[in-house]
A protein has these predicted regions:
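Small/polar glycine-rich anion-binding or flexible loop at a beta-alpha turn
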Residues: 52
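Compact, charge-rich alpha-helical regulatory domains located at protein termini
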Residues: 1-36, 41, 47-49, 57-83
């Protein structure tokens, strides 16, 4: 299967983190570090639970037993491999 961005996953999709990347040269290195500290690390399974109103922000993402509400910009930094 092909990798995609977490921000592009449909609701309910299971996936595995492949990498945390800067989507542009404007990305804040502190943001990438924070995502790694939260558990978005290579090989970690996750599930995109649902999106906010209108299919936008926040994105509810489950890693292990931890639930995170991510902004679209944050989700665009996470490459995943859908299950």
């Amino acid at each position: 299967m092909k990798t995609t961005l977490l921000s592009d996953l449909p609701n309910g999709t299971h996936a595995t983190v492949q990498s945390v990347i800067a989507p542009s040269s404007q990305a804040d290195p502190a943001l990438l570090r924070r995502l790694n500290e939260l558990g978005f690390i290579r090989g970690e399974p996750l599930q995109m639970l649902r999106r906010g109103p209108g299919g936008r922000e926040p994105l509810a993402v489950l890693i292990g037993e931890s639930l995170f509400a991510l902004r679209l910009l944050e989700a665009q930094c996470i490459q995943v491999l859908p299950a």
